[in-house]
Amino acid sequence: MYSPKRVKLNLTNGMRKRPETEENRGELYPPTAMARNGISPYFIGKPRRKIVGDHKASEAGPPPPFPLKPKRKEPDDDPESIVIDEDDEEDEPAPQVEKREPKKTHNRPFFGEKSSLTATELETAKKEEVVKKKDPFTMRGFDFGSDEKVVKIRDKICDIVDPTGARRSDPAFIQQMHSNTLKGIEVATNPKFKQKRTANNKNRAAIGSTLGTIYPNFLTASGQEPQKSKFQIPLDRQSSSQSNHSQPIRKTLPEIPRRCSNSLVKKAMGMDTDGGGKDERMDGLRSEPTLKHFDENIISLIESEIMSVNNQIGWADVAGLEGAKKALKEIVVLPFQRPDIFTGLRAPPKGVLLFGPPGTGKTMIGRCVASQAQATFFNISASSLTSKWVGEGEKLVRALFSVARLKLPSVIFIDEIDSLLSARSESEHESSRRIKTEFLVQLDGVNTAPDERLLVLGATNRPQELDEAARRRFQKRLYIALPEPDSRTQIVENLLRGTRHEITDHNLEKIRRLTDGYSGADMRQLCTEAAMGPIREIGDQIATINKDDIRAVTVADFTEAARVVRPTVDDSQLDAYAAWDKKFGCLPPPL
């Protein structure tokens, strides 16, 4: 058994030399020893060991487990020797290796400058290389006919092409299916396939019609014939490809500049809103210098609160409340109609407060003001001016008044204003306090012009909970009390206009006595209940009876309805409203 020689390893072969000591001076680096012996799993090269003389295998050790091939003959080399690059140290004898013929494999042989193949094999490989250069796809004609997936796909295609199965036994049909499969695989594996597809229109048409050529009876899932392309040819290309006598189907649209505004694009495409209202308003508001520091979502939220009054409500529709209607005409309608007269001391107040028990018509008066004032009407609630983000509520209040001042004359109606401007205390949250402060500053502050036509109309059921600073800014505080007897009679007449009834003046007097203490909402509920009296008498005949056969509403229906509908306002609450009106109200008591 011979001991392999110790070699110096450099950094080019991926290993470092083990440092020499007295203990390991006679040892060899383990990977090197394994590589020299030919048993290393990482060794993929061929040993190049110099054979010296006729040493026997017993003296030099066993032969390596792989064959050694003679190197190409060079001028200075022995034709039967194999050389390994080592140091200048003395070589130890290596075993003689018997010459073995290389094993033939099915893989393609490697050939190059230092090939160990025979001349016949080299000639055969060169011929294959020449054939490959001429037609590089001859070696890719693999037969996948027996593959399981290909068989399944072929069966599905056969079911489509031959659903009855009559041609399954035809050898020509089977051969066609097999050849089509191989042809499709060969086309798909061709790297020039995409280049051929995009070469020209003729090639596209040829490739698009491949399916129809292979399967002439093929139909799509919808039962239609396959189309070559689902995209329409542009008009300029189509017109150029046709004759000069053919005219285009439609005119081409002019090219729109990139910097064109969205509103112009929408109008050109016929997608603008009715009159361009909201988009034009939003674009106009964006250009205002006073709104540039507001976010777009804040301006959009305020714009959404602008109320468009479709149903015209007149002062005659509001029963009673003559003092409140007269005061509102002087405050809202007349100054907006003649702003040149109402200047200086005649300038209308900035804030009007409507207070009273629930159901007395405060909200309806606000709708009437919006209809009669011909002004921009903002219908605001407490939720419109609050946000979960800190500082967002103050911005909403400031944006509300900024937009209202840009759209003068304006009316801001806030229902249930006590939830927004309640009395400030130490226990309330800081954000709520800031919103109230901002509202009061915007309503009557340093930047408020004395002659601007901006009115804040508030309605509340709890005036005693308002902050004292807010109470001062509402110069006109109008008490909307319960309807008087004559007002209740007028409410009944107004509600019965579209219903058949037999109510006379004598019956109205009786209804007036029955409804003492009723509010306007209670009177409406009473009339609704009385109108359902004739319907309840019909019973199951409601599906077949004629509309004209339903009897009219009588005073008996009101009497029966009065037993169900009761007044909702307590007398103690009325006393509290009367006391607050006596202390802070601005309407003189009725004569």
Curated annotation (Swiss-Prot):
InterPro entries annotated for this entry? Answer: AAA+_ATPase, AAA_lid_3, ATPase_AAA_core, ATPase_AAA_CS, FIGNL1_ATPase, MT-severing_AAA_ATPase, P-loop_NTPase, Spast_Vps4_C
Q: Which residues bind ATP?
A: A319, G359, T360, G361, K362, T363, M364
Q: What is its main location?
A: nucleus
Q: Write out the annotated subcellular location.
A: Nucleus
Q: What is one Gene Ontology biological process annotated in the Swiss-Prot or TrEMBL record?
A: cell division
Under SMART domains, the record lists: AAA (SM00382)
Q: Compositional bias (Polar residues) spans?
A: 237-249
This protein's source sits in the domain of life called Eukaryota
Cellular component GO terms, alphabetically?
nucleus
The reaction(s) catalysed by this protein are: ATP + H2O = ADP + phosphate + H(+)
Tell me one GO molecular function of this protein.
microtubule severing ATPase activity
Per the UniProt record, which EC number(s) apply here? 3.6.4.-
Q: Where is the composition biased (Basic and acidic residues)?
A: 17-26
- Cofactor entry: Mg(2+)
Q: Which UniProt keywords apply?
A: ATP-binding, Cell cycle, Cell division, Hydrolase, Magnesium, Metal-binding, Mitosis, Nucleotide-binding, Nucleus
Compositionally biased, Acidic residues: which spans?
Answer: 76-93
Which principal EC class is assigned to this enzyme?
hydrolase
Chain intervals for the UniProt region annotation (Disordered)? 1-117, 223-249
Record text on subunit structure and interactions: Hexamer.
Q: What exactly does this protein do? A: Has a role in spindle assembly which acts in the progression through mitosis during embryogenesis. Required for fertility.
**Which PANTHER family would you find in this protein's record?**
AAA DOMAIN-CONTAINING, FIDGETIN-LIKE PROTEIN 1
Similarity section: Belongs to the AAA ATPase family.
Recorded protein name is Fidgetin-like protein 1
Origin organism is: Caenorhabditis briggsae
Highest classification ranks of the organism: Eukaryota, Metazoa, Ecdysozoa, Nematoda, Chromadorea
Q: Which gene encodes it?
A: figl-1
